[in-house]
């Protein structure tokens, strides 16, 4: 009998019993008959005829029949020599503070030639449900160093907000930049609190890549190592040539690690998941293999619920210092925001950051289009005591002026520049400078929130005071004057 390397708790099932009752293989699934007492989500060890072993998980139970998804793929599995051992345990992952600075594959095994992890605990990758009354409302801003996000789509600690991208757009570069620069806002007037709860030592990043190619994986590894941010990053890599089924457990292992770092070690964890479109495709593949009734575009009808089991693991808990903030990244097929993956993601998450192809084609980096972007929890993360008292008003005025500038630009294409008023020309000037100076910044150009707000005021001073309708007179008195040192 094969030995089981997972923690086994005693149950009604006879632990370690092996079966040679494989009746069929369908895609990533193995079907077994005559199994005594199989449990949903139970882990099984599969030994092939050549002696190699694989792991799987029970997906469906029907009497004595069990359907098992194999994490390493079903190639080489036959019904004559393959034995399946039921462990009586759900899938658990070892967790430890030592996981920071390490690189793992999609199943949570180290691939950086380092020593094995000495686990401080084994945790169920599905996570434990959080009592809604114990959740704390997300507050305090996570600073990304990117002006369009920090000023106009501020991310609160404990929020979940996705990046909507598409093929060929620089979402990987933006994700790497956020990893390099992300941290809590440093407020000089609260130095004691800053050291205790907001220090860089208390900030960690868990990065999970699903279905990425080798070039992308090397890009992230090299970027983290060269920029010295690797020591606070835990990296999980599921490559495009790894088994598709592994993509279903990769984000869950990453989030289980994040939960341990946040709620047991008191760290503020930023979880970046890329690419959730690959995850959804893996879900569709398993659903098709199980011959389930397909939903929109072949995706399973339960995909909304399944995505929610990942996204809803972000947040803060009463009485715990740590927090989990999620930034999932997904690529929209054919730039279609109505595709099921971005559509359902937008319903669950608290806003979105939209990466725009037109801005990218005009050599503007990062090509974040602020008009379709939104952060629903922004108001709780900004303002006096958290960022600056003018933050909300400046953001509203930038949105208003940029939207008017876009309308004027469209009108100019119809009637020509000669037909525009002097006021319209101001909006056109603002539009150009906003994109070239505010939106555009280097991949290694870090702007703190105060620098970004000052830059925003520089742009708003293009207009006379009477055109800044969204900003109260008191705020204008303090910040509008050109020699203001805010």
Curated annotation (Swiss-Prot):
Primary localization class, coarse: membrane
Gene3D superfamilies the record matches: 3.40.50.12240
Alphabetized InterPro entries for the sequence: ATP-synt_VA_C, ATPase_a/bsu_AS, ATPase_F1/V1/A1_a/bsu_N, ATPase_F1/V1/A1_a/bsu_nucl-bd, ATPase_V1-cplx_bsu, P-loop_NTPase, V-ATPase_su_B/beta
Annotated protein name in UniProt: V-type proton ATPase subunit B1
Any one GO BP annotation for this protein: negative regulation of actin filament depolymerization
Subunit organization: V-ATPase is a heteromultimeric enzyme composed of a peripheral catalytic V1 complex (components A to H) attached to an integral membrane V0 proton pore complex (components: a, c, c'', d and e).
Cellular compartments annotated: Vacuole membrane
Molecular function via GO: actin filament binding; ATP binding; proton-transporting ATPase activity, rotational mechanism
Membrane topology recorded in Swiss-Prot or TrEMBL: Peripheral membrane protein
Alphabetic keyword roster: Acetylation, Hydrogen ion transport, Ion transport, Membrane, Transport, Vacuole
Organism of provenance: Arabidopsis thaliana
N-acetylglycine carried by residues: 2
The keyword Disulfide bond is annotated on this UniProt entry: no
UniProt record similarity statement: Belongs to the ATPase alpha/beta chains family.
Function in brief: Non-catalytic subunit of the peripheral V1 complex of vacuolar ATPase. V-ATPase is responsible for acidifying a variety of intracellular compartments in eukaryotic cells.
Keyword Ion transport: yes
GO cellular component, one term: plasmodesma
HAMAP family membership: ATP_synth_B_arch (MF_00310)
């Amino acid at each position: 009998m094969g030995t089981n390397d997972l923690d086994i708790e005693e149950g009604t099932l006879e632990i370690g019993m092996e079966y040679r009752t494989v009746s069929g293989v369908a895609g990533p699934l193995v079907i077994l008959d005559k199994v005594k007492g199989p449990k949903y989500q139970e882990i099984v060890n599969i030994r092939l005829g050549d002696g190699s072993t694989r792991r799987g998980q029970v997906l469906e139970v029907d009497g004595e029949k069990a359907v098992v998804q194999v994490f390493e793929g079903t190639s080489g599995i036959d019904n004559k020599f393959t034995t399946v051992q039921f462990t009586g345990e759900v899938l658990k992952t070892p967790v430890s503070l030592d996981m920071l600075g390490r690189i793992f594959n999609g199943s949570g095994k180290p691939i950086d030639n380092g020593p094995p992890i000495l686990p401080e605990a084994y945790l169920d990758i599905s996570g434990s449900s959080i009592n809604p009354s114990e959740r704390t409302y997300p507050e305090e801003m996570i600073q990304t160093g990117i002006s369009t996000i920090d000023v106009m789509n501020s991310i609160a600690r404990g929020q979940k907000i996705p990046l909507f991208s598409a093929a060929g757009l620089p979402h990987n570069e933006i994700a790497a930049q956020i990893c390099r620069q992300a941290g809590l806002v440093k407020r000089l007037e609260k130095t004691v609190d800053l050291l205790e709860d907001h220090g860089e030592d208390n900030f960690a990043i868990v990065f999970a890549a699903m279905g990425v190619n080798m070039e992308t994986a090397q890009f992230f590894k090299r970027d983290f190592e060269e920029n010295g941010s690797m020591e606070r990053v835990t990296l999980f890599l599921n490559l495009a040539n790894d088994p598709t089924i592994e993509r279903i457990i990769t984000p869950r292992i990453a989030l289980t690690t994040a939960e341990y770092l946040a709620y047991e070690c008191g760290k503020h964890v930023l979880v970046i998941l890329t690419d959730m479109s690959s995850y959804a495709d893996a879900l569709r593949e398993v659903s098709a293999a199980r011959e389930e009734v397909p939903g929109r575009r072949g995706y399973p009808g339960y995909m909304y619920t399944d995505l929610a089991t990942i996204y809803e693991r972000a947040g803060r808990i009463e009485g715990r210092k740590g927090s989990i903030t999620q930034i999932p990244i997904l690529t929209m097929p054919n730039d279609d925001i109505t595709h099921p993956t971005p559509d359902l993601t937008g319903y669950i998450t608290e806003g979105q950051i939209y990466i725009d192809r037109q801005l990218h084609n005009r050599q503007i980096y990062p090509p974040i289009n602020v008009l379709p972007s939104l952060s629903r929890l922004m108001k709780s993360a900004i303002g006096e005591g958290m960022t600056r008292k003018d933050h909300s008003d400046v953001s509203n005025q930038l949105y208003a002026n940029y939207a008017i500038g876009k309308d004027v630009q469209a009108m100019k294409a119809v009637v020509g520049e000669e037909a525009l008023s002097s006021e319209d020309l101001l909006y056109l000037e603002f539009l150009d400078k906003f994109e070239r100076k505010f939106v555009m910044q280097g991949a290694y150009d870090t702007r703190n929130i105060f620098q970004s707000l000052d830059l925003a005021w520089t742009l708003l001073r293009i207009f006379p005071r009477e055109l800044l309708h969204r900003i109260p007179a008191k705020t204008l008195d303090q910040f509008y004057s050109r020699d203001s040192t805010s």
